[in-house]
């Protein structure tokens, strides 16, 4: 009882201080908003999309070429750039957006997949009485609620458990989390609560039990980041923005303002990356929303511009779904080096991350083995010793570059800005940098406000609060049932389509091929263990997918869930895209090779394959080597030193096991390091050595060969005197 009174007293004191800060900050926030909107001139805002469907990429390119001048040209198709385009076009501004790669090809698709207010920022705000940190949290919590509302199919609340291993931490964390709920106010998703040790283990049975005191559960949001980014860009296109991916800005256009005599940025020279065609896109205002590449565009404007971006790499890994409960995440608030690690269920898998390492800016960040192992070690610290955390259980890994920035207008140019920065150069180039995924909308609003004021544009107020993104307006939690009933899709596929496309899922279902089976009637899967279907490839092209990498990483999320499954699906994906886009054989092969290179370097396949090669010398006991050699030779009956698909088929037929040829090719390809269609004895021994060390989670070939050996050993010859054939 005394303990509860002490805790309540702490809350009252902390809450009183926070209420004072809250009141002052809200008044200041209101004044800032009024000042921002004072200069906005009346204009006709667009209340409904002008296009039922986004125009084709070809149509968008024609609009870019044939429009004499846009009001706004946004460079960058990530979350912030797409948000700027949507904010501008819905204010009635003539808007264009160009992206040198694909929408969400950079940092925006490589996040932790959380929509959060920032618990740690609130802790700093209270401990240091930092009003800026508090405002960041307040703004993020408002934006979190808005994002969950406007894209309900792509986002949902997620309970996150904070395990406590020291008794004094329980009231400390509880007060902090309750203040997080308090700051959220009406935007609080669900109230946080405390769990006893036994209840915590019920929810998270694989948790480390020793010294566990209890746990605190709070709520944040989770989303499908690349699909969310795409939904923002597609919504902007439907409202009339000319958006084009694979359009690179080669240089900025400039002209002298006749009224002031100053040189002003007046557009950009753009190059179609797919065809090489170049043309000018003119605009009254150009916005630089290029994330980690902020400085490269600023230097196009002014070659002497000081760098403001300090890039930091954040690595994440994906592990099998059994590593976490299906509907609850875990937060490690203090890792061995002071970082925060999240451990979250996502798309029926488990995401663990992230790291925070200074890096160079690159279009192709590669996850390092050091960072992967750091995350694995932190996971081991929090999971029960009964759970063996193996390197081979890493199904995919990626690195995203955080565009941390310094404010060029600040007196202390060395300090990292914890919020976003809107900078206006002497020539009128507007740069938006920093911030985080959750606050993309408010960042876009601030940026367009600055553009309207600086360039005297005629625009209405921002309308993006509550504006549904594509697929969200008519979505409901039971929409998938109609897909099952009306089209004959299997339930898992229907749920996936509803959660990916929202009310547009019916259009995908209409494209689905007949399976030829009694059930499901339609919906041929790309790979058996994931609910992605072939119709999504056709529909993905309508969503501006231009390459196989677009399809495996951002239209579907296969590359982020399992690199091997993505590689297995690639040939069929390329075949389907080739039909729609009229690719010849050379183009198809080029797409295959590019996509495999992407999986190998950027999605962790290289690190995964190194567990079998560079770092996996054969370290088996002599008895194990003999045992595996005997198993191998049961397949290699001709003593060739290698086995082929024919050898495997022969053994399987002898034990009455049927398996189609495509599956067998996939099974052998997993182990065929030389990619010569043969699995050599040395490759097989390397595989078994890696499995024993836990560097590889398992192999279908290894399991198949073990099962075949056991079946062959059981077939002992029947003695003549027991076969009814003796005399």
Swiss-Prot record:
Its cofactor is FAD. Its EC number is 1.1.5.3. CDD domains: EFh. InterPro entries: DAO_C, DAO_C_sf, EF-hand-dom_pair, EF_Hand_1_Ca_BS, EF_hand_dom, FAD-dep_OxRdtase, FAD/NAD-bd_sf, G3P_DH_FAD-dep. GO terms for biological process: camera-type eye development; gluconeogenesis; glycerol catabolic process; glycerol-3-phosphate metabolic process; glycerol-3-phosphate shuttle; multicellular organism growth. Pathway: Polyol metabolism; glycerol degradation via glycerol kinase pathway; glycerone phosphate from sn-glycerol 3-phosphate (anaerobic route): step 1/1. The modification Phosphotyrosine is found at residue 601. Residues 623-658, 659-694 form the EF-hand domain. It catalyses: a quinone + sn-glycerol 3-phosphate = dihydroxyacetone phosphate + a quinol. Keywords: Calcium, FAD, Flavoprotein, Metal-binding, Mitochondrion, Oxidoreductase, Phosphoprotein, Repeat, Transit peptide. FAD binds at residues 71-99. The keyword Repeat applies. The keyword Calcium applies. Changing residue 650 to C: Found in patients with type 2 diabetes; uncertain significance. Ca(2+) binds at residues 672, 674, 676, 678, 683. Pfam families: DAO, DAO_C, EF-hand_7. Belongs to the FAD-dependent glycerol-3-phosphate dehydrogenase family. This is Glycerol-3-phosphate dehydrogenase, mitochondrial. The lineage of its organism: Eukaryota, Metazoa, Chordata, Craniata, Vertebrata.
